[in-house]
Amino acid sequence: MLGQFIGSQKLPYKNVAVQLSKSCFGLTLIKSKRITPISTSRYEKHYSTTSVKYAIESELDSLVHSRNSNTIIKQSDVLPENIWRNYLKNNEIDKFTLHLLASLRGDDDFVKNLFKSGDLTYNELSIFINRIYKSNGHDIKRVIQNHHSLSYTELIYEIFELYTSTIPKESGIIKLNALHLKDLNLFITIFIKEAQLSKAQNVLQYIIDAEGSIEKITDHDTMVNFLRLRCGGLPKFWLVPQASYAVTKQTKKNSRLSSNSPNTRFPSSYKSTVPNTVLFEVINMILNKKVWKSKHSGILDSTIVYSLAHTFQKQMMDGFIKEHWGISSHGDPLDLFIKKKKVASAPSNEILIAIMSSYIYKDRNIDGAMKILDKFIRMYPDISLDNMFWRRLIQWCNRLWDPKIDRQGTFGYGCWNMMKNWNGAGTGKDVVLPYDFQIYEEFYRLFKRTNNGKIAAEIVSNVLIPHLSEKNVAVKKAELNLLNKYQTLAMNWLIERRQFKKAAFFIEEWSIDRNNRIQLREAFKKRKQLMLRKLSTRDKKSQSQKKRQDRYDEMEEEDMIIGRLW
């Protein structure tokens, strides 16, 4: 497959004949003589045994023979004038990637020559990296999924090495401009998404080495990634203590907030790797240096809060929040704060999530976080709480909920009522609950365990069916499964209360399509029959007990009569 992709394009191989072959993509490479692989770079030492360059070479070697090996054609007859721009124009990121990496096999200076000739510009290479990032590498993963010798993250690491080879040096010193920093931080983000933190650390270290030290860095994205990778500022990788009921032989006492998502990858370990003194110096620099005053953002401030929470710097975290937003975990909000600070806008949703999560993580309970959130809402009435906020809140509630201590799920239901009130409940207006798959997936665990079919029916009728029935919405299988879970919970709840007519009406009224209706009807019949058998068995037992009791009463009465006769 790799050969098919790159074989139809103009490759700068030495001593390679290109021959036409019938395949789904056109041409296939035919190897005629040995090709010397390029030399390894200073970063390749970490992956020398499984280098992607050798994997690509091996893959090409297995595809060198063609069915039509006698048909030789000229490269100029089939290749576009500028294949690289053609790839970008057609958004063929997979072909661009594999062609680029394969081209390096025969020419170490291939990319530099592309820039010299004008066939490719630095901006176009940056566009290529941005498109990999935005697409999450789906096209590349699809191409290499059947080739166990090729790894997506190692392919990306090869592109990183290639990219750094194009960065100019002055007197042997690397000079990074704004575009370089932007692209390099995209590499870091890609590796973080794939949970390849060692590769992300290598890219970050490359930037730090080029700049001299972390104290000399004034780039926003680089500082955010430094806090994430070396100061614990990545909450999705935090280990969260599980409630006792959730711990089984298959699960651990600690889990991660996003561990329910099948698409989320996790590193084997995650922790702060720098002394607290370094973290304090970095935060002090961000707060006090003039160059940073215009670079504050929700992402940067929230990452600082996460880092302080992960390193258990409670006092400094409280001080940072108080300095920025006038809210203290002790005492009332600072009433004069807004008057004193002319610019005191409400914190972003991202910051509120960070503050909430950090207090819960630090305290190992919900109380402190709820109290400080209440203070924020009172001081900043125009605060906006989006789906991500509610998702994170119910995730925390579920992780820390222990039904042995709290059978009613107090905090979980508190979260549910808070979300309803925030969206109009109690104001006389129609309640429009937000739709978010993960929110209701988390709530389902609460309602299922507490057997709350009433709220399940409310969610089906007010949230799930209205959203999934929209014409422009493409319904996913996971969403249909979640809908079926809520429908089944509501239906079974009605059946348990012997409200068979209401359960049947619910099915007819709130099924999304014919298949869903048939499925629910079958489940209804089975559940009803099971319920009737239980009732019948219960009645028989009751009648049997009544008969035994009657016989016992008769025997007692006879004994009393005989006793009087004697």
Swiss-Prot record:
Domain of life (superkingdom): Eukaryota
Transit peptide: 1-35
Entry-linked InterPro entries: ATPase_expression_mit (IPR024319)
Region (Disordered): 536-555
Keywords: Mitochondrion, RNA-binding, Transit peptide, Translation regulation
Gene Ontology BP annotations: regulation of translation
Cellular localization per UniProt: Mitochondrion
Keyword Mitochondrion: yes
MF (Gene Ontology): RNA binding
GO cellular component: mitochondrion
Family membership: Belongs to the AEP2 family.
Subunit and interaction comment: Binds to the 5'UTR of the OLI1 mRNA.
Its biological purpose: Required for translation of the mitochondrial OLI1 transcript coding for the mitochondrial ATP synthase subunit 9.
Protein name: ATPase expression protein 2, mitochondrial
